[in-house]
Amino acid sequence: VGFISTSEAAEAGDSFTSVLADLERRLQQVEEENRMLRERLEPASTPTPPTEPAIDDSGLPVFLQQNPPDGQAKPVTAEPKKEKKWFEKYTVRGYTQLRFNDVLDSDGRGAAHLVGDSSVGDRQSFLLRRVRLIIQGDVSEHVSLYFQPDFAASVPGSPDNAQYAQIRDMYADVHLDDLKELRFRIGQSKVPYGWENLQSSSNRLPLDRNDAMNSAVRNERDLGIFFYWTPVEVQEFFKYVNDAGLKGSGNYGLFGVGVYNGQGGSLREQNDNLHTVARITLPFEYGNGRHAEVGMQGYVGQYAVLSAPISPLGVGAAVRPSGTLEANNEQGLQDERLAWTFVAYPEPIGFQAEWTVGNGPALNAAQTAVEVQSLSGGYAMVMARRKLRKGELLPFARWNYFNGGYKSERNAPMSNIEEWELGLEWQFSKSLELATVYTLTDRTNTTALSSANTRSYQQFEGQLLRCQLQVTW
């Protein structure tokens, strides 16, 4: 009994086969439903673009190759510079000079007087000699601006004539190349005549400029157009001298040439004639890296002399000399000079000298007419530099000489000047310094006296003690 018959076994096999077929059909149905569900849920795939054939660029420059060799990476293009705001383009600085002068001794012939310092004389004491504000900056890559007013200017003719604002410098430098070797300077600026004239008053050791060179250009400045050529290595020379505190004259080119009105800074032009000036300077190093310059300069033009009534030789009524602008000489008189310069910077001993010759307007011996006469003069100075634990000491001695017409003064008085100066500048810091100078002088008082029977232009001989406190900011 315990065995299955043949017919029953066949029926069981057919039933099992039917179940398997049904399961397989259901599985296929589920897979199809899953496929359709995935297609609805997943986005269509983006077709892959065809691969471009490789280009052989090995023969091109490295910066053009797509895959340069190792160690020769393709340079990265720099991002464009961010434009600066207007107040980020400019710097503001300045300095103030407070003076006190005392006449120690006088021979009594002429009153004490210095062209460059109105506080030398009777009834004088403290004076704000300069109050300068300097604004400068780059307007663009090739144009820079320089503006310097003085708030200690004086206006003649009134007891409250001091401490007025007056423009000293207002010019633009237009650079013709990226290295700034070639540039035009347009506006009111210093005339490139005389190394000491070009040197800033904040850097000069003597309190005033020498008369021979300074009498060439009133206020050292004028309105005009100047061209300067300054090779890169010369720019570096001037920059080093300035940064090292050697009291340089600034960057006025290895070569400069220009035209200007001729009457002097802050004065109106009086004739239809331009002055022409040219200057060359050769900076060099000598003896263990010391720095020096040699130079030559000259100018030519017609100068209109302004006048004031005087009593000729102190006899008779006061009259205006002939040959002056107010005496109908509107074209002016011949004005020409040539000068030489040598400067050895104080490292630690220095020497500085300039000499000029020429022809220019000068009052004649009878004091009745202004005529063209010869002139000559100059100066020589030795100085030293001693660094202290705090600050510096700079002693100096200078001889100053001039014989000729002082054209920028009324009536261009014939002046005879010879003086010796012994001084010491003590720099407590970069922002504070004190200069003390003893002066032994014999010079012409260039003040025109309009009273009848009163002689103008007497000689002043005497001794001066002069002090100046300078604050730089």
Segments (PLM) and residue ranges:
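Outer membrane beta-barrel
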Residues: 79-112, 118-265, 270-277, 281-288, ...
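Bacterial N-terminal signal peptides
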Residues: 1-2
